[in-house]
Swiss-Prot record:
Binding locations of L-glutamine: 54, 354, 382-385, 405, 462
UniProt: CTP binding residues: 13, 148-150, 188-193, 224
Every Glutamine amidotransferase type-1 domain range: 292-534
Subunit record text: Homotetramer. Interacts with BrxC.
Organism: Bacillus subtilis (strain 168)
Annotated GO MF terms: ATP binding; CTP synthase activity; glutaminase activity; identical protein binding; metal ion binding
Documented EC number(s): 6.3.4.2
GO biological process: 'de novo' CTP biosynthetic process; CTP biosynthetic process; pyrimidine nucleobase biosynthetic process
Name of the protein in its database record: CTP synthase
Documented activity regulation: Allosterically activated by GTP, when glutamine is the substrate; GTP has no effect on the reaction when ammonia is the substrate. The allosteric effector GTP functions by stabilizing the protein conformation that binds the tetrahedral intermediate(s) formed during glutamine hydrolysis. Inhibited by the product CTP, via allosteric rather than competitive inhibition.
Residue positions of the active site: 381 (nucleophile), 507, 509
Note: CTPSs have evolved a hybrid strategy for distinguishing between UTP and CTP. The overlapping regions of the product feedback inhibitory and substrate sites recognize a common feature in both compounds, the triphosphate moiety. To differentiate isosteric substrate and product pyrimidine rings, an additional pocket far from the expected kinase/ligase catalytic site, specifically recognizes the cytosine and ribose portions of the product inhibitor.
Record flagged with keyword Ligase: yes
Length: 535
């Protein structure tokens, strides 16, 4: 029978519940169990697709085209699995489904209520995640903090599951904060006690408490937390701040987190074999050189908006025994006069995705600077589009060339709306989303790094390169190295006489793994390392 683990959080948000859940998933997977994982977000949006990155951070896209929470990126990278639309559930999705059922008459004229209709729908999403993947264990992270009004139906649903399927099949892990009070020079357990008290008042007794802390906590403090929260002392797991995220699974294993889970759930499985993971952590802790990549974006004040991009850069760096630092460059501040200064000290330039006109001209300037000065360059989504616009303007001489998204009246719409998008009115969930094939041209840099004729990558866009300009651009040395199999859509562009100038319409960052870097990132970082070594 499938087992269900729920990870909740207390005291404050952004405690790292997602990292704890992902780390546990990795440990259980390495014990030979089939693990899947999901995130429940209590906000009323149907998904984060239309939310500002300043509000939510990155939107992570799955193979099947779901626009999801950035924690799913952590899950995929840590556990090395591909998730799907059942892996992210929001209040908006649940209410939308229940209201559709009510309109169809599925409830036979009954009064639709939070209990049982909303809670039943929530439980169904948990069960479905297990059925769709045939999982031995489903880990569900509940977003937000215990005590939030929005979280109450979620907590009630997971409370009910203990009665529905039995105590040994359900487990609750609660993440809390033990803050350090600098003036007193002490760690304080009271917030944890109150958080657990709040959770217990809702009918949930945590089996394990994971304590986030700036510094090690004493055994006496663990005993105190165990006493007040009514759990075994060994079930108080310390999670100290770490410089290297990938060390956390090993720290949790050292304290027996996965063993506690297996004992409670009567899971007969081998010890977690973590030698490959230990090699990764050892490598990350002992990198021999450092390079700096300039990231030119519009959301640089919030690094979480580019979290998968940054992680992918780091993964690629590991392959070259290199620590990759990121220099954040606000695209709105970039001009022809200051680009050299803003990118000084960098060994490569990356222009990631984005929407809207803010900062686009700065990205075009940065792209031109990389092209003209033989600086390794990687463009993603909008980054590919601005690379195309820049080339059209400054090499082909098409003054005023632009994207129809930004300048609908441009004489040279190098980037235009996808034909199938012309009648679309809604913004949410209507982009070209998910995994699509890309056919690579032999003899190109893209083919060289992928070593494959057809590759599959994840997309999130509404605009595309305008084929009316394709021949004209090709004649001037612009290389279309990847297209859709029918040749209709441009997927990758590059330049021949350049150390590395490659850009993709898709989002390669969504498929990178710490032990298996994504090929375009690996090629980009390889060129950047070479450039750094030649200085």
């Amino acid at each position: 029978m499938t087992k269900y683990i729920f990870v909740t959080g207390g005291v404050v948000s952004s405690l790292g519940k997602g990292i704890v859940a992902a780390s546990l998933g990795r440990l259980l997977k390495n014990r030979g169990l089939n693990v899947t994982i999901q995130k429940f977000d209590p906000y009323i949006n149907v998904d984060p697709g239309t939310m500002s990155p300043y509000q939510h951070g990155e939107v992570f896209v799955t193979d099947d085209g779901a626009e999801t929470d950035l924690d799913l990126g952590h899950y995929e990278r840590f556990i090395d699995i591909n998730l799907n639309k059942f892996s992210n559930v929001t209040t908006g999705k649940i209410y939308s489904t229940v209201l559709k059922k009510e309109r169809r008459g599925d409830y036979l004229g009954g009064t639709v209520q939070v209990i049982p209709h909303i809670t039943n729908e929530l439980k169904d999403r948990v069960y479905r995640a297990g059925k769709e993947t045939n999982a031995d264990v489903v880990i569900t992270e509940i977003g937000g903090t215990v005590g939030d009004i929005e979280s109450l139906p979620f907590l009630e649903a997971i409370r009910q599951m203990k009665s529905d399927i039995g105590r040994e099949n359900v487990m609750y892990i609660h993440c809390t904060l033990v803050p350090y009070i600098k003036a007193a020079g002490e760690l304080k357990t009271k917030p944890t006690q109150h958080s657990v008290k709040e959770l217990r008042s809702l009918g949930i007794q945590p089996n394990i408490i994971v304590v986030r802390t700036e510094m090690p906590i004493s055994q006496d403090m663990k005993d105190k937390i165990a006493l007040f929260c009514d759990i075994d002392t060994k079930a108080v797991i310390e999670c100290e701040d770490a410089d290297n995220l990938y060390s956390i699974p090993l720290e949790l294993q050292k304290q027996g987190l996965d063993k506690l889970v297996c004992e409670h759930m009567k899971l007969a499985c081998k010890e977690a074999e973590m030698s490959e993971w230990k090699e990764l952590v050892n490598k990350v802790s002992n990198l021999s050189q450092t390079i700096t990549i300039g990231l030119v974006g519009k959301y640089v004040e919030l690094p979480d908006a580019y979290i998968s991009v940054v992680e992918s850069l780091r993964h690629a760096g590991y392959a070259f025994d290199t620590d990759v630092k990121v220099k954040w460059i606000n695209a709105e501040e970039v001009t022809e006069n200051n680009i050299a200064e803003l990118t000084s000290g960098t060994d490569g330039i990356i222009v990631p995705g984005g929407f809207g006109d803010r900062g686009v001209e700065g990205k075009i300037v940065a792209t031109k600077y990389a092209r003209e000065n033989n600086i390794p360059f990687l463009g993603i989504c909008l980054g590919m589009q601005v690379a195309s616009i820049e080339y059209a303007r400054n090499v082909l001489g098409l003054k005023g060339a632009h994207s129809a998204e930004i300048d609908p009246s441009t004489q040279y719409p190098i980037i235009d709306l996808l034909p199938e998008q012309k009648d679309v009115e809604d913004l949410g969930g209507t982009l070209r989303l998910g995994l699509y094939p890309c056919k690579l041209e032999e003899g190109t840099k893209a083919f060289e790094v992928y070593q494959d004729e057809v590759v599959y990558e994840r997309h999130r866009h509404r605009y595309e390169f305008n084929n009316e300009f394709r021949q004209q651009m090709e004649e001037q040395g612009f290389v279309f190295s990847g297209t859709s199999p029918d040749g209709r859509l441009v997927e990758i562009i590059e330049l021949k006489d350049h150390p590395w100038f490659v850009a993709s319409q898709f989002h390669p960052e969504f498929k990178s793994r710490p032990t298996r870097p994504q090929p375009l990132f690996k090629g980009f970082i390889g060129a950047s390392v070479e450039a750094a070594n030649q200085k």
